[in-house]
Amino acid sequence: MHIIVGLGNPGKKYDATRHNIGFEAIDMLAKRNNIEVKKLKHKALCGEGTIGGNKVLLVKPQTFMNLSGQSLLDIVQFYKVDPKNIVVLYDDIDIPVGTLRIREKGSSGTHNGMKSIIYLLQTDQFPRIRIGVGKPQFGDLADYVLGRFPKEEIPTMLETLERASQAVETLVKDGIAVSMNRYNG
């Protein structure tokens, strides 16, 4: 089983914000694969299904971003999943808007949701897909990531969510190396 986690903050006021692009990626993946992500368990909205004949659990933690590790730790302990079968999708301000960076493992960088996950799982040895949301030229970083995409960036981000979904599907079916080669940008 693969655990596919999109990071974000719960609540309507955070819908469609840069920081919730991980949730949006899960929504797109769920739609493409006819999986309902509605069941509340393990402090997350979850949906079980298959991708390319492989069992997956799609997850949107409901703990707020900086505590995402609490939800994922619950899930990993319950399902006894190898960290290599976890995929985390999240926003990254250090990558240009619309760019994907897929890695097999690594540090959290500046992302507090990833810091929580790595700290509580006690490993950074799991795949992740960073979705570029760009960086503000000026102003407060928190306001920027909790803000929405401007109209002119929305088509780019919709296409990016489509590619992120395809990257996850490829990773589940064909492995991380194939996904990295095909979708890293």
From Swiss-Prot:
TRNA binds at residues 14, 64, 66, 112. Pfam families: Pept_tRNA_hydro. Belongs to the PTH family. Gene3D superfamilies: Peptidyl-tRNA hydrolase. It comes from Alkaliphilus oremlandii (strain OhILAs) (Clostridium oremlandii (strain OhILAs)). The active site is at residue 19. Its EC number is 3.1.1.29. This is Peptidyl-tRNA hydrolase.
